[in-house]
């Protein structure tokens, strides 16, 4: 799917004004091997525990984007090389992490988009804590399962519905 977030913003100024198209804060860095990705959102809300991330990525991604609201924690990584490979294998379009990743070199080789706040060498806990498929608030932007995510080098858009066919 070819698109530019800049063009989508220009073409949908009415949606931006109405709040049905939103722009995430420009704080996410690219780590995956794919720099432009889009798809309907699947959501996770968790904190310093990536058990649910693995569970989600083990499912058929069907071109979806996994949005991981890790509370913005910079104390450990929620996605690493093994999970990047799992996302690629299972057909996920991308992962947006409000938190950290690790194994940056491995993630760069995965054919999946990965955006995160930073890299961190420490792994997360594995307690099975968190919530899946619920609305999340990522840095002030509400994302509900099924919202459309569009990401490229210029930013990340969240739309209530698909903007492209």
Swiss-Prot record:
Family to which the UniProt record says this protein belongs: Belongs to the class II aldolase/RraA-like family.
Organism: Burkholderia mallei (strain ATCC 23344)
Broadest EC class assigned to this enzyme: lyase
UniProt-recorded Gene Ontology molecular function terms: 4-hydroxy-4-methyl-2-oxoglutarate aldolase activity; metal ion binding; oxaloacetate decarboxylase activity; ribonuclease inhibitor activity
Catalytic activity entry: 4-hydroxy-4-methyl-2-oxoglutarate = 2 pyruvate; oxaloacetate + H(+) = pyruvate + CO2
Residues involved in substrate binding: 80-83, 102
Cofactor(s) this protein cannot do without: a divalent metal cation
NCBIfam families assigned: NOT-MenG, PRK09372.1
Cofactor binding, note field: Divalent metal cation.
EC number per UniProt: 4.1.3.17, 4.1.1.112
Lineage of producing organism: Bacteria, Pseudomonadati, Pseudomonadota, Betaproteobacteria, Burkholderiales
Residue sites binding a divalent metal cation per the record: 103
Job description of the protein: Catalyzes the aldol cleavage of 4-hydroxy-4-methyl-2-oxoglutarate (HMG) into 2 molecules of pyruvate. Also contains a secondary oxaloacetate (OAA) decarboxylase activity due to the common pyruvate enolate transition state formed following C-C bond cleavage in the retro-aldol and decarboxylation reactions.
Keywords assigned by UniProt, alphabetized: Lyase, Metal-binding
InterPro entries the UniProt entry points to: RraA, RraA/RraA-like, RraA/RraA-like_sf
Protein's recorded name: Putative 4-hydroxy-4-methyl-2-oxoglutarate aldolase
Binding partners and assembly: Homotrimer.
């Amino acid at each position: 799917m070819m698109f530019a977030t800049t063009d989508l913003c220009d073409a949908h100024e009415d949606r931006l004004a109405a709040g049905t198209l939103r722009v995430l804060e420009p704080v996410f860095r690219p780590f995956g091997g794919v720099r432009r990705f889009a798809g309907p959102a699947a959501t996770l809300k968790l904190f310093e525990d990536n058990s649910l991330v693995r569970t989600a990525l083990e499912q058929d991604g069907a071109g979806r984007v996994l949005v991981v609201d890790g509370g913005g924690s910079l104390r450990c990584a929620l996605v690493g090389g093994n999970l990047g490979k799992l996302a690629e294998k299972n057909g996920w379009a991308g992962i947006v992490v409000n938190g950290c990743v690790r194994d940056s070199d491995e993630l760069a080789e995965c054919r999946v988009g990965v955006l995160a706040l930073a890299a961190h060498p420490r792994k997360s806990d594995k307690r099975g804590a968190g919530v899946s498929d619920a609305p999340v608030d990522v840095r002030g932007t509400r994302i509900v399962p099924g919202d459309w995510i569009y990401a490229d080098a210029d930013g990340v858009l969240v739309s209530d519905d698909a903007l492209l066919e």
